[in-house]
UniProtKB/Swiss-Prot annotation:
NCBIfam families: fmt. The lineage of its organism: Eukaryota, Metazoa, Chordata, Craniata, Vertebrata. Residues 1-33 form a transit peptide. This is Methionyl-tRNA formyltransferase, mitochondrial. Pfam families: Formyl_trans_C (PF02911), Formyl_trans_N (PF00551). It comes from Bos taurus (Bovine).
């Protein structure tokens, strides 16, 4: 008869790693755990194989795919991988809640809003895009610890926005890491499984998220099928190659015309454009660039673009293609629509703003009528909170 370890006394130091294997206490417990139905010293037995009881933590669309895979595994009675599945998500201003909560409610899964985590007993926790640090005391309540589905090849892109930074920096290879959570710091725990995929050319962060979310969900199920073995074979992250993926802000979306090349601007657009529209200044007004397009070579050969020195940020309306051409550090980008009080096509913007300006200032140089870099004050850094759950 299998009996699960009570949540309040889970002190099994599972998960391999050189540090724990060299610890005498870990070696002693490992020898004990090798015997069938080993006890933790308080009379409770630890389940040695599936089905597992899982507490899932997540919020967004990426996490939703992981939850969907866990739910499908729970519904598959033939495999007997998941016996119990409950969900923790953060509160949302929307009555519907975030994607994870929506899925949990639709699927009739028990769902708690952080910091409430319920009072059930679980074998293992799973985190995907949760964004909250968990205390060591809380992690130790899970006999098999807490796993994290992270959409990067750790240690590259530690932090809350790995997919965005993958696109932003022009990476050609992306991936997913299944790792074990450690307290006090994000994304530093032992790696249990890691796979890579090529980044499709000109992929947006949303498109790459869809690819990586499916990959990560499948990898997690694979790890859960051989959980004790996966934990014992975990490897520490290398010290080399560490990069960080901080959370984006409105300031991230501000184009620096004098500093950024057309390639960098398009990467920025593909990375954050679906979350925060790119922004700039026009005549002291903030203007959002909604639809960016690459400029055809035939347009770039126009004498208006090549016949004079043009200052970065200069705006020219190209009537034939009905786009705004904007000069950046090394080239031009095209803009099909903008938002200035309301959404305007490039033609609307020209007729309503550019053309009247030129009529009033017929002697002025085109360089005087240009987009300029919008400087937003950086957000104050907030202290990370480690929540010690009861």
């Amino acid at each position: 008869m299998r009996v699960l370890l009570r949540c309040c006394c889970g002190h099994l130091p599972v998960g391999g790693g050189a540090g724990r294997r060299s610890n005498p206490r870990w070696r002693a417990l490992a020898r004990l755990s090798a015997s069938p139905g080993w006890e933790d010293g308080q009379g409770a037995r630890v389940r040695e194989k599936p089905p597992w009881r899982v507490l899932f933590f997540g919020n967004d669309q990426f996490a939703r795919e992981t939850l969907r895979a866990l739910h499908a595994a729970r519904e598959n009675k033939e495999e007997e991988l998941i016996e119990k599945l409950e969900v923790v998500t953060v509160p949302s201003p929307s009555p519907k809640g975030l994607p994870v909560k929506q899925y949990a409610v639709q699927s009739q899964l028990p769902v708690y809003e952080w910091p409430d985590v319920g009072s059930g007993e679980y074998d293992v926790g799973v985190v995907a895009s949760f964004g909250r640090l968990l205390s060591e005391a809380f992690i130790l309540k899970f006999p098999y610890g807490i796993l994290n589905v992270h959409p990067s090849c750790l240690p590259r892109w530690r932090g809350p926005a790995p997919i965005i930074h993958t696109i932003l920096h022009g990476d050609t290879i992306a991936g997913v890491t299944i790792m074990q959570i450690k307290p006090r710091r994000f994304d530093v725990g032992p790696i249990l499984k890691q796979e890579t995929v090529p980044v499709p050319p000109k992929s947006t962060s949303k498109e790459l998220e869809a690819v990586l979310s499916r990959l990560g969900a499948n990898m997690l199920i694979s790890v859960l099928k051989n959980l004790p073995e996966s934990l014992n074979n975990g490897r520490q992250q290398p010290a080399e190659g560490v990069t960080h993926a901080p959370k984006i802000s409105a300031a991230t979306s501000c184009i620096k015309w004098e500093e950024q090349t057309s390639e960098q601007i398009f990467r920025l657009y593909r990375a954050v454009g679906n979350i925060i529209p790119l922004q700039t200044l026009w005549m002291d007004n903030t203007i959002k660039l909604l639809d960016l397009v690459e400029v055809d070579n035939s347009i770039l050969s126009d004498s208006k673009l090549t016949g004079q020195a043009v200052i970065p940020g200069s705006v020219i309306y190209h009537k034939q293609s009905q786009i705004l051409l904007v000069c950046c550090k090394d080239d031009w980008i095209g803009v099909r629509s903008v938002m200035l009080k309301k959404t305007l096509t490039a033609t609307d913007f020209y007729n309503g703003y550019l053309h009247p300006w030129y009529q009033k200032n017929s002697q002025a140089q085109p360089s005087q009528c240009r987009f300029q870099t919008l400087r937003l004050p950086p957000k104050k850094k907030q202290k990370k909170k480690i929540v010690a759950m009861q």
